[in-house]
Structure formats: structure tokens, C-alpha cells
Regions:
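Short glycine-/polar-rich loops that comprise or flank the Walker A/P-loop
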Residues: 68-73
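Structure-specific nucleic-acid interaction/processing domains
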Residues: 26-27, 53, 60-64, 76-106
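GIY-YIG nuclease catalytic motif and its immediate N-terminal context
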Residues: 1-57, 83-91
Length: 106
């Protein structure tokens, strides 16, 4: 998260109640993972959301699927456009190589 640190917001508990009560429908890129002993987020998944409730809506969809039982926290970067979120997501997947992202698909 070093390059985007000033824009990065997090870490928040990856929990249905937390996300449901989060009053934000902004689009952007989100990071799901666990907080390491050094306080940084170890990223397991990077995703983008720009419609249908933005990041909040996409996180609620992931939570309803209940597929990442080891994910405990999330963070995000708000983006001004869908193109910006697509570019950031792609670059972050390449940079972070998260275990739940399928490499080569963005």
C-alpha cells in the first residue's frame, strides 16, 4: 500500500454488520486480508467496485458468499472513475499477487 498510502483507508473489520452500517457507496478498489503483526494488511484479495452500491455493495456480496473464512479485515482506495479503479486494481494485483485473485484476469 505504500504508493497509495495517503489515499488508503483502513483497516476495518471484515464483518457483515460493520459493512452494512458503513455509509459509503463510493467506487474504487478494496483490499481484503488479515492484519499482520507489524500492523500492515496482508492482502488476500484485491477487487474493484464502481456501481451497485460501490465498495460497500461489493463487500456485502462477498460476505454473503462466505468464501474467505480467513479474511478478517479490509481497506480501500476511492477512485474518481471506473477507468481509474480498473487500472489501480490491475496494478495492485500484479504488485501484491494476492492468493484469492486469479492472475491474468482483471
Amino acid at each position: 500500500m505504500n504508493y497509495y498510502k495517503q489515499m488508503y483507508k483502513g483497516h476495518y473489520n471484515y464483518d457483515k454488520n460493520v459493512v452494512q452500517n458503513w455509509n459509503n457507496t463510493q467506487g474504487g478498489v478494496y483490499y481484503c486480508g488479515v492484519v499482520a503483526s507489524n500492523g500492515n494488511l496482508t492482502v488476500y484479495y484485491v477487487g474493484k467496485a464502481f456501481s451497485d452500491g460501490g465498495i460497500r455493495g461489493r463487500l456485502l456480496q462477498h460476505l454473503s458468499e462466505n468464501k474467505w473464512r480467513d479474511v478478517t479485515h479490509f481497506g480501500y482506495v476511492e477512485c474518481a472513475s471506473e477507468n481509474e479503479s480498473f487500472s489501480l486494481e490491475k496494478n495492485e494485483i500484479i504488485r501484491l499477487n494476492p492468493k484469492y485473485n486469479i492472475q491474468g484476469t482483471y
